Amino acid sequence: MTAVGTDGLDAIRTDPSRAVLGFDFDGTLAPIVDDPAAARAHPGAAPALARLAPRVGTLAIITGRPARVAVEYGGFEGVDGLVVLGQYGLERWESGALTEPDPPPGIAEARAKLPGVLEAAGAPPGTFVEDKTHAIVVHTRRCAEPQVALDRLRSIIEALAERTGLAVEPGRYVLELRPPGVDKGRALRSLADAFAAKHGAPPSAVLFAGDDLGDLAAFDAVDALRAEGVPGVTVCSASNEVTELAERADLVVDGPAGIVELLGTLAAADSAPE
């Protein structure tokens, strides 16, 4: 645990009712699986979130998935007080209500062109596409050599993104096409700013937990808030596939099981993580 991370956890423990806590879904609250549609939250995640939600100022899941999908796969429908920001913050689910914009035109164009692009490039067997409505994802996890396949496809996906006005976000054997200027850092910052606007003061602390490259933007947001005087904590749900987050994080835990343990500790009034 880093010194600044310890300060952040102490601030959460001292004044949890003004803390803003954000968690990624896949790889953080839910184990990574070969089929995205088969992903489900760790069985302890929803109960732990339900215990924590009444104690903190804002409790949110920030995910690249559609918000309703994360709610369904996580079993979060009955977690009072939980906010789910889907599609990197484009969608907001709260108390059963979903707010979402129309998909940008570039997504429809990319959706139409991507099958032909992959075929022309000779995409390796096992390559598949996930349609998130506001984003399109190319997966290589099922390929015989996932990283080789990902590297082979990277340049053609980047070229398609440029033609359609989209951005490419790499991840754990994925390349995601999504609108530019949308990321988990902006989503986390929006939660902190909304809290400050509502309460007339910044949060007592901010925490974000993630596992993949797309979560680094949220780590950057925590760092920016620290620079403004808000204690912060960055948490890595560790895997053997991505090391960058562990190198940046204040606290590294053992995958979704470790995240659930952290949630339970945060929910306990008389203790904080070591």
What residue spans do the PLM features occupy?
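Structural recognition of alpha->loop->beta junctions
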Residues: 76-91, 159, 245-261
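Conserved acidic, metal-coordinating active-site core of Asp-based
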Residues: 121-209, 213-221, 228-230
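Active-site phosphate-binding/coordination module
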Residues: 40-132
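Conserved Rossmann-like nucleotide-cofactor binding loop
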Residues: 28, 67, 214
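Non-catalytic pre-domain segments flanking phosphatase-related domains
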Residues: 1-25, 29-33, 44, 51, ...
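The start of beta-strands in P-loop NTPase/AAA+ ATPase cores
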Residues: 19-21, 82, 206
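Mg2+-dependent phosphoryl-transfer enzymes with acidic/Ser/Thr/Gly-rich catalytic loops
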Residues: 2-3, 16, 42, 185-274
